[in-house]
């Protein structure tokens, strides 16, 4: 497993031959990349807490600008507006007690049903509090000029979704 992007032409976290493999985890940081995890206030989070994937120092494959962006406005808006002088990648991530990483998806995914903007992260935050759901996926379905929010869930073990669970 890996996490990175075409914008960085590589991986930010990836597997390695020196660390144990745990189900659902990515083993470690890429060489030369100062990966960290911040909360919404720009403070480092402790292990086993989810937060924003950030890179605190310039790294070998970091783009230096965007094409046709002479004043670097688009470039700065893409990566450096959430935290001052810190690369904000736009992914939710957690460092586990094993030293590995779990990626939870985009932190900047926004849906717009009925003209009301809502980030998928807000929905995931609530769904994660429900103990009978193991995994979930939120998507927007465009229909007749609007967006319908769809939530797909995988139940824990042998649980079945019932009307009382929904209500």
Located regions from the model:
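AMP-binding/adenylate-forming catalytic core of the ANL superfamily
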Residues: 59, 85, 90-167
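Conserved AMP-binding/adenylate-forming
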Residues: 1-2, 6-100, 107-110
């Amino acid at each position: 497993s890996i996490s990175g992007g075409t914008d960085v032409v590589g991986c930010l976290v990836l597997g390695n031959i020196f660390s144990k493999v745990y189900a659902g985890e990515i083993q470690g940081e890429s060489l030369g990349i100062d990966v960290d995890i911040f909360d919404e206030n720009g403070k480092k989070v402790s292990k086993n807490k989810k937060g924003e994937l950030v890179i605190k120092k310039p790294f070998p494959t970091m783009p230096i600008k965007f094409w046709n962006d002479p004043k670097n406005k688009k470039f700065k808006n893409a990566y450096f507006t959430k935290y001052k002088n810190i690369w904000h990648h736009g992914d939710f991530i957690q460092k586990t007690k094993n030293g590995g990483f779990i990626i939870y998806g985009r932190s900047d995914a926004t849906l717009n049903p009925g003209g009301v903007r809502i980030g998928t992260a807000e929905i995931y935050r609530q769904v994660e509090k429900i103990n009978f759901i193991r995994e979930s996926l939120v998507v927007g379905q465009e229909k007749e000029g609007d967006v319908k929010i769809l939530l797909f869930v995988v139940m824990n073990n042998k649980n079945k979704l019932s009307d009382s669970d929904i209500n």
